[in-house]
Amino acid sequence: MIKKIMTTCFGLVFGLCVFAVGLLAIAILATYPKLPSLDSLQHYQPKMPLTVYSADGKIIGIYGEQRREFTKIGDFPEVLRNAVIAAEDKRFYQHWGVDVWGVARAVVGNIVSGSMQSGASTITQQVAKNFYLSSEKTFTRKFNEALLAYKIEQSLSKDKILELYFNQIYLGQRAYGFASAAQIYFNKDVRDLTLAEAAMLAGLPKAPSAYNPIVNPERAKLRQKYILNNMLEEKMITLQQRDQALNEELHYERFVQKIDQSALYVAEMVRQELYEKYGEDAYTQGLKVYTTVRTDHQKAATEALRKALRNFDRGSSYRGAESYIDLGRDEDAEEAVSQYLSGLYTVDKMVPAVVLDVTKKKNVVIQLPGGKRVTLDRRALGFAARAVDNEKMGEDRIRRGAVIRVRNNGGRWAVVQEPLLQGALVSLDAKTGAVRALVGGYDFHSKTFNRATQAMRQPGSTFKPFVYSAALSKGMTASTMINDAPISLPGKGPNGSVWTPKNSDGRYSGYITLRQALTASKNMVSIRILMSIGVGYAQQYIRRFGFKPSELPVSLSMALGTGETTPLRIAEAYSVFANGGYRVSSYVIDKIYDSEGRLRAQMQPLVAGQNAPQAIDPRNAYIMYKIMQDVVRVGTARGASALGRSDIAGKTGTTNDNKDAWFVGFNPDVVTAVYIGFDKPKSMGRAGYGGTIAVPVWVDYMRFALKGRPGKGMKMPDGVVAGNGEYYMKEHMVTDPGLMLDNGGAAPQPSRRVKEDDGGAAEGGRQEADDESRQDMQETPVLPSNTDSKRQQLDSLF
């Protein structure tokens, strides 16, 4: 009877086992073909950030959530490989993807506990989970994980699997992979890890937060001890090595990626361009982008601009705290302040600080980054003293929780503030358009708005050279006489009223030459020139310099620069004068490398005299250059002559009520544009002239940029002749002084003979017939805008 019962039980158990094996086999056969392809493992491309470099190899920007550095398995030290294997998978080199004995132990433990508490996942299974599966704790997921681990083991070598694991695993503090973790936790190369450090990092995969040695040092130490004991048990280390490692004092030095702060606007331009092309993939492919700017040029440009903005703001009243945070209880304040300040940047030696307390004597206690506390007395508060607990200033007053800026002046801290006035500087290689320096404002961190590329402002008189160039193309010369006298134009003002423009200084000189008029920036002369050549013709002609039609108002006010453009666009346009008449497009991306260091793309720029389109007659460019040299020598930009160079030319610009100030200066190699103005346009007062505030910025930067470069000037092109103390296109050379425009802007027929080889009298007559105006526009070829040309270049780059 008992034997029969035992036989029956055995049969049932055996049957159940067979049934279970059958079900397992069916499950395997049904699931295995549906497992994902291993292409992502066989062609592993880890998510690596976009890194932007200057031309001299300095990092100027890093973009991407995951901080990872791909490392070959052979470059990880043996001590780290052993530590990880001892911690995560002792039988890694023996099993086929799943550790059967480990699974058996886990199953027993899970049955006893009644839940999925232990997973016994091998390194291969963790690779399967990290790349393909979720983190949910279910038997289905574990089953798929085991099958996928087996598939991985059949396709990849053990070292390749380990390489994937070492580079992909998340280890806390935004570190992905052990190479990145070595930098972030210990600020050292992974190859330089000690045994103690390796064992500490090897404890992180199990639970990065729980075993973070910075946040939970005691738990992390216990985990390290467990791993070292495992290594000893597996004969990976000796007892002496274990004890030394346990007694080693570890120093955690948080790695901070050093990003050069001088070119943040340039780095952001690159980020935007690559994001537009690649989308979110731009931040994960590990691209390394080299730009055209050098950090030394960037620093010189940044300091030149900041100096002018600081000087203008000197003497201004204190505008108040820049922000406010709620500090809550005293015991929580220090931690809250430290966390808040860690997200702020020191700019121009202006250190962010948070007010902790205001004493009865109205001294102010502040906390600096790093936790240091400083008490500011009335002297240290300076111009900000009136803002201390001043209810009239409302939210801007200095009170507990206020965020202010301070500067250390020889050991004494004092309250300072960032200037409200803003500006931009753009410097280009005149022959290629390569950006040599670009600064889009005082502080990138406070406002990422790039005034060099995004601020659409009136260029004022810096636009006049384009009108004068159009006049030369119509037959006027630098010696043409124009009447600098007041003018009233019925129907040309707002709502059809009379337009009565004026010279900025209110003075008029009568008949003067075109050269004299541009040198002195005479508004009346510019208007009469435009009346003479026709607005339609001028607009079409000026588009050759890269301006869009929307930037060129179809009215006489165009002569005064009432359209809107950006500092970058105006610098590009002036490069036509500087390089002999060729249109080049600005660019900041020079080369792009992939994550493995292979050259992926390189800019092939348009080069003046080679493949760049001819925008204007080279003789026209030369004569305009010679005229604008006088602007620097004796005109509104004579402050630029402080460089002591004879090859400099340029033009200042100031808009109505001194709201915008400009200077664009150049020689045949470099074009630099400077713009100054408030983000919300308002008058800068008497100091807000281009020659007063913009020229000094240009001088400070160009003194550095042109250091060591000889001043050769522009070579005179064929077809230009000198006579009567002036330069002429050969066919427009006259024996007597220049033609004269009458008060209406029309040029009378010359009373003297033109040279025999002129081919006809100088053009310049007033365009009154519609047919003639249309003919003028047809004779003026229009090149693609600089935006179109730049897009074509970038498309070829990518």
Curated annotation (Swiss-Prot):
> One GO biological process from the UniProt record?
response to antibiotic
- Listed as disulfide-bonded, the cysteine pairs are none
**Single GO cellular component annotation?**
plasma membrane
What GO annotations for molecular function exist for this entry?
Answer: penicillin binding; peptidoglycan glycosyltransferase activity; serine-type D-Ala-D-Ala carboxypeptidase activity
Residue numbers spanned by region Transpeptidase = 378-700
| Top-level division of the source organism's lineage | Bacteria
User: Coiled coil located at which positions?
Assistant: none
Could you tell me which pathway this protein works in?
Cell wall biogenesis; peptidoglycan biosynthesis
Membrane topology (UniProt)? Single-pass type II membrane protein
Name any one Pfam family assigned in the record: Transgly
Name the segments for region: Disordered: 739-798
Q: Which residues lie toward the Periplasmic compartment?
A: 31-798
Which residue stretches does the UniProt record annotate as biased composition, category Basic and acidic residues?
765-777, 788-798
Name the residues annotated as catalytic in the UniProt entry.
E88 (proton donor), S461 (acyl-ester intermediate)
Q: Which residues lie on this side of the membrane: Cytoplasmic?
A: 1-9
Q: Where are the transmembrane segments?
A: 10-30
Q: Which reaction does it catalyse?
A: [GlcNAc-(1->4)-Mur2Ac(oyl-L-Ala-gamma-D-Glu-L-Lys-D-Ala-D-Ala)](n)-di-trans,octa-cis-undecaprenyl diphosphate + beta-D-GlcNAc-(1->4)-Mur2Ac(oyl-L-Ala-gamma-D-Glu-L-Lys-D-Ala-D-Ala)-di-trans,octa-cis-undecaprenyl diphosphate = [GlcNAc-(1->4)-Mur2Ac(oyl-L-Ala-gamma-D-Glu-L-Lys-D-Ala-D-Ala)](n+1)-di-trans,octa-cis-undecaprenyl diphosphate + di-trans,octa-cis-undecaprenyl diphosphate + H(+); Preferential cleavage: (Ac)2-L-Lys-D-Ala-|-D-Ala. Also transpeptidation of peptidyl-alanyl moieties that are N-acyl substituents of D-alanine
Sorted keywords for this record are:
Antibiotic resistance, Carboxypeptidase, Cell inner membrane, Cell membrane, Cell shape, Cell wall biogenesis/degradation, Glycosyltransferase, Hydrolase, Membrane, Multifunctional enzyme, Peptidoglycan synthesis, Protease, Signal-anchor, Transferase, Transmembrane, Transmembrane helix
Q: What does this protein do?
A: Cell wall formation. Synthesis of cross-linked peptidoglycan from the lipid intermediates. The enzyme has a penicillin-insensitive transglycosylase N-terminal domain (formation of linear glycan strands) and a penicillin-sensitive transpeptidase C-terminal domain (cross-linking of the peptide subunits).
Which protein is depicted? Penicillin-binding protein 1A
What is the originating organism of this protein?
Answer: Neisseria lactamica
